[in-house]
Amino acid sequence: MSQVILDLQLACEDNSGLPEESQFQTWLNAVIPQFQEESEVTIRVVDTAESHSLNLTYRGKDKPTNVLSFPFEVPPGMEMSLLGDLVICRQVVEKEAQEQGKPLEAHWAHMVVHGSLHLLGYDHIEDDEAEEMEALETKIMLALGYEDPYIAEKE
């Protein structure tokens, strides 16, 4: 049986109203076991200052972002189940959900699904990559009981 080990780090000034650890686990389990047997993922929920700093340092973008993915690169010859880290900014996720008229829980789920696919090597830089990744995200979100996260863009 495939298993995802979750290391959840809540690094917000106010952690109230965040999804439960069991929800994060459910969202990870909907994605990762399809691709690899055992995995360990860290999800760190942060405020805008930390997201902004990481986004500037690692992507050269001078603003906070919804989710950053940091895949772990296993040295040659070693076998490790550590997949990587997701850093999710609480305030950006909450703002986007409100602006896009999406249920907050669904947007949290989407950020975990989206970030997990990045950890697994998916990307959306080129149009064909974006189509493949978005199709996978939609399939997983529907399987979790949420709407297509890209429905507004398709209308």
From Swiss-Prot:
Residues bound to Zn(2+): H114, H118, H124
Entry GO CC: cytoplasm
Keyword Nuclease attached: yes
EC annotation from Swiss-Prot or TrEMBL: 3.1.-.-
Family matches, as InterPro entries: MetalPrtase_cat_dom_sf_prd, YbeY, YbeY_CS
Family affiliation: Belongs to the endoribonuclease YbeY family.
Reported cofactor(s): Zn(2+)
Alphabetized GO MF terms: metalloendopeptidase activity; RNA endonuclease activity; zinc ion binding
GO biological process: rRNA processing
UniProt-annotated location(s): Cytoplasm
Assigned keywords, A-Z: Cytoplasm, Endonuclease, Hydrolase, Metal-binding, Nuclease, Ribosome biogenesis, rRNA processing, Zinc
Cofactor note: Binds 1 zinc ion.
Classification via HAMAP family: Endoribonucl_YbeY
Primary location: cytoplasm
Record protein name field: Endoribonuclease YbeY
Cross-referenced Pfam families: YbeY (PF02130)
Domain of life: Bacteria
Primary role: Single strand-specific metallo-endoribonuclease involved in late-stage 70S ribosome quality control and in maturation of the 3' terminus of the 16S rRNA.
The organism of origin for this protein: Shigella boydii serotype 18 (strain CDC 3083-94 / BS512)
Primary enzyme class: hydrolase
